[in-house]
């Protein structure tokens, strides 16, 4: 999708829902995007495309007439005619040091997933380094976490939910270039319960989950979005709302 279309959609949502919309961007996954039959670039090029796209989105959010001639995208003179009262913040999904630094330079915040504390600290520092190089205040940069978990009434059920519904949580390799759900299905057969260790908390104990969430808040995350991988969503929301 051309970044101009993304910018228009984002600006329209922000105009409709003032203060409630932010734009999250990433470098993509083949599983979702190869189906249109276009060229699927290697990771470095996808990242470069993403940052050029952000440049275009930023220009359009200014409300001025915009023209762009870049390495990957072109834009004839145009502008966004529907602008929100508040420009939506742009958050980038990433987990690598080089991309994290550039995210600090160009974006308003970072989205990442649960990881060991040492890696999280590295990502934080690279983002703050990028902020300083760009002349912006690192204190205004937002860190957002998507935390996968599996909760159920018993540990056995929680593990079964993880194995059945979210086996990719135990896959210890990059998955961005996998093109077919059938390939995922075959790879999922290789996942064992121990593969989730240190990658996703699987527990029936709400207090264990509360401690896990608090651990990431203590690291410095501003927001933590929870993803319970099982289908027991209503029960999970009730229990976590009451006990976590």
Segments (PLM) and residue ranges:
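Active-site-adjacent structural elements that line small-molecule/cofactor binding pockets in enzymes
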Residues: 1-243
